[in-house]
Regions:
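Membrane-anchoring alpha-helices and their flanking helix-loop junctions
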Residues: 1-96, 103, 121-178
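Short, conserved phosphate/pyrophosphate- and ester-handling motifs at nucleotide-, phospho-/glycolipid
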Residues: 112
Length: 178
């Protein structure tokens, strides 16, 4: 499922608008490093201390199925949000030429639905793996997302006067909570 999202993402990046502002490399590093740490934790269990490979979720089909459903739902939600952004999307924080504020589709529920979907999928992956490394990976990725949200919010407030109202009315990452 993750591979399917990667293929979709790759093709969807071909026709984005040109950027008129880009996030600095230093700022980008602050959200990319935790994401990479999370990916390593999930992908390379034999490199990790044994405590991170300790199973914390009971084995069995029900947790695996629930995890797989969360992965599918989360990736689907993220893909929907990405498609809704259209040419405004970028993998790094940018301000595009003729940038438009999107408040429809999944953006009605949360301001950063791509991260919401990816986080749900990652939690599902961690549940399926069932080890401490999954929990630690989720924490690292959440830290990366929270930094990126902070940077994106600053740019959105600077470029869209109506963003302040959208921010008051719509949760950032988790509907009705945050």
């Amino acid at each position: 499922m993750w591979l399917g999202l990667a293929v979709f993402w790759t093709f969807a990046t071909r026709h984005t608008k040109p950027a008129r502002w880009r996030e600095s490399i230093g700022s980008r590093t602050l959200h990319v490093l935790p994401l990479l740490a999370g990916a390593v934790l999930l992908a390379a269990p034999h490199w990790l201390p044994s405590v991170l490979s300790t199973r914390i979720v009971p084995g069995g089909r029900s947790f695996s199925v629930l995890g797989a459903v969360m992965v599918a739902g989360g990736l689907g939600f993220a893909a929907w949000a990405r498609a809704r952004l259209g040419r405004n999307w970028s993998g790094i924080v940018t301000v595009k030429e003729d940038h438009a504020l999107v408040r429809t589709g999944p953006y009605r529920a949360v301001r950063h639905p791509i991260y919401t979907g990816l986080l749900l999928a990652l939690i599902g992956t961690a549940m399926t793996i069932g080890e401490w490394r999954g929990v630690v990976a989720v924490i690292f990725v959440l830290i990366g997302f929270l930094w990126k949200i902070h940077v994106e919010e600053e740019r959105m407030c600077e470029n869209f006067p109506e963003y302040a109202q959208y921010r008051q009315q719509t949760a950032a990452l988790i509907p009705l909570l945050y």
